[in-house]
Curated annotation (Swiss-Prot):
Region (Disordered): 109-144
Protein name: Augurin-B
Propeptide: 19-68
Gene: ecrg4b
Lineage, highest ranks first: Eukaryota, Metazoa, Chordata, Craniata, Vertebrata
Signal peptide feature range: 1-18
Annotated GO biological process: anaphase-promoting complex-dependent catabolic process; cellular senescence; central nervous system development; G1 to G0 transition; negative regulation of cell population proliferation; regulation of cell population proliferation; response to wounding
Intracellular or extracellular location(s): Secreted; Cytoplasm; Apical cell membrane
Main subcellular location of this protein, as a coarse class: secreted
GO cellular component: apical plasma membrane; cytoplasm; extracellular space
């Protein structure tokens, strides 16, 4: 009896809320539309100098921004300079060399067996799906 007495008010509440939320025909409420109109009027009424920055100041700020060059290796060492010269002799340009080196160094870091967990990290669902929890290759037994 108590379950029935709880279900009826709950169903009535859900139906009233769904009717109230679906009325109006649009996704935005009237209050939301009024607030948007008010904000648009405030923005239009502001003077332009209040919003924008002078062009000279903007160019001065943007001219200082530049991306620093990525160096995977310490180029001050003579052996590194020799390696880079050899790679460039083989046809690599420096940007391609940096890209390839960072890729392979990241690969080496991610495939380190000491950092592997006891589940297969390459599986579609990882450890969440028990079918892909394998105890074989790529398993670090230090965790047991």
């Amino acid at each position: 009896m108590s379950l029935h007495s709880l279900c009826v008010p709950t169903i009535l509440l859900i139906s009233v809320l769904s009717i109230c939320l679906s009325s109006g025909g649009s996704s935005d409420s009237k209050l939301h539309r009024i607030l948007i109109k008010r904000d648009a009027k405030e923005i239009e009424s502001r003077p332009k100098a209040y919003i924008s920055v002078q062009q000279s100041k903007a160019k001065e700020f943007l001219s200082g921004l530049h991306r620093t060059k990525r160096n995977v290796w310490d180029r001050s060492r003579p052996d590194v300079q020799q390696w880079i010269q050899q790679f460039m002799y083989m046809g690599y340009d420096e940007a391609r060399l940096e890209t390839d080196l960072s890729y392979w160094m990241d690969q080496a870091r991610s495939n380190d067996q000491g950092r592997q967990h006891h589940h297969d990290e390459n599986a579609p669902m990882s450890q969440q799906d028990p079918r892909y929890n394998r105890h074989g290759a790529n398993v670090n037994y230090d965790y047991y």
